[in-house]
């Protein structure tokens, strides 16, 4: 996001050179906020034991987040939510959850919850137990997360609280 913010500030400064200082000041403020959010999120993720740092969701929308903060993503679907979900995908992921004793899986605000609920039932059928750890915001924001920074911090809180 820092790269995109700089690109936007540069383009606005090009279009409205008389406001360049204003755009640069806002950019620096935003970059500082992003840096603070990054540190906050890393601290929250560090509260989770390393062996529990699995982020399991309906689709693979959190790959970049997970890579940056040291989580492993496992998803029922890939990035697209349009593809069909097969029972084999649910079975394989349920086996993985039981094998790794994963405590929580997550629903997403913009994705139907049925596949995650089916995954939870498949884990129970195998004698395991996994909780739905909360709702994550991937393609949309929630009531209390009207900015990108508030959204990623809320996601970090939800993940950390469920997995630690």
Enumerate the predicted regions with their spans.
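Extracytoplasmic metal-acquisition and chelation regions
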Residues: 1-164
């Amino acid at each position: 996001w820092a790269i995109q913010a700089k690109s936007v500030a540069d383009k606005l400064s090009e279009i409205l050179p008389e406001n360049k200082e204003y755009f640069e000041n806002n950019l620096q403020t935003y970059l500082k906020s992003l840096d603070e959010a990054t540190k906050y999120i890393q601290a929250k993720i560090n509260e989770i034991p390393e062996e529990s740092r699995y982020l399991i969701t309906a689709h693979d929308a959190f790959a970049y987040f997970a890579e940056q903060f040291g989580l492993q993503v496992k998803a029922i679907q890939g990035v697209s939510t349009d593809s069909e979900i097969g029972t084999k995908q649910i079975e394989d992921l349920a086996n993985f959850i039981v094998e790794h004793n994963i405590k929580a899986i997550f629903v997403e605000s913009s994705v139907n919850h049925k596949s995650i609920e089916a995954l939870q039932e498949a884990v129970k059928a195998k004698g395991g137990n996994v909780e739905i750890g909360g709702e994550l915001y991937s393609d949309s924001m929630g009531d209390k997360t009207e900015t990108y920074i508030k959204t990623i911090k809320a996601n970090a809180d939800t993940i950390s609280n469920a997995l630690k």
